[in-house]
């Protein structure tokens, strides 16, 4: 690695020089790594009073416990022997090493190695967040502690949210791509990978010649985000042991080819009929059954039904006993009340 001058490792903030072309790439990287909506309520949409208070507390805690800025120092002969924490190679005299106070005085990195543990991007302006011995950019450090809504790119501070497709969404942000109606607590299909309500799904595939291939069906359900999730990213989603995989088969009775589940799920982890999976505290326990054959298996349902209900019923509604065609989805949904999975 060739020595780099201190100007290259400047810790100054990004600025737009009117005499030069703006550094849009650097600005975009800065906004990606340090989302303003994670830091200041002025950049957030539709925050309630409680959410605003939670955001302020969240920002203050991160600033106090994790935020830092690296310092670039020339490696002097007396400092020879320092090993880069990432590549494990020695820093040579005349090179610049980056030191992070929160990591300890003896730990240092090559400047290109001073990067986010999650995304691998070099930390712009050497701004870092320190968590469990690792460096993170602001975006991915925040996601260790709070779920991020894929629709609006804001962290979720409300107690209620919608869980679907292995992610958490603001309660009304998981919507049908056609009619924009919220799907929280209701069934949906995934034609082409985008959520679609049963009514729009039927309209789209009302033509008998249309293909169902690649269209899956699932059920979004409501849960709670919890207040403190400092144990790591694996707590931001439902435990994979409580979730079986996917749903609707392709037309013509062919077996399901595409299966969806949470990262890390496997056939060995799936619940068998009759098994009771223990859900993590503060998280909703829900299961989506894999449909192997349209003739043998009903639609998927949420597994958190009360044990006191009669067999064949779920939350007061009779479970479907036979394969439903697209034409019957709308009729069934128009008669059945909207079901929400709520936390006890």
UniProtKB/Swiss-Prot annotation:
The keyword Metal-binding applies. One of its GO terms (cellular component) is nucleus. Residues 1-81 form the PET domain. Residues 272-296 have a biased composition (Basic and acidic residues). Gene3D superfamilies: Cysteine Rich Protein. Residues 257-271, 322-344 have a biased composition (Polar residues). It comes from the Eukaryota. Keywords: LIM domain, Metal-binding, Repeat, Zinc. GO terms for molecular function: actin binding; muscle alpha-actinin binding; zinc ion binding. Residues 253-344 are annotated as: Disordered. Residues 82-147, 148-207 form the LIM zinc-binding domain. Pfam families: LIM (PF00412), PET (PF06297). GO terms for biological process: actin cytoskeleton organization; heart development; muscle structure development. Expressed in a broad range of normal tissues as well as in hepatocellular carcinoma, breast cancer and prostate cancer tissues. Belongs to the prickle / espinas / testin family. This is Prickle-like protein 4. It comes from Homo sapiens (Human).
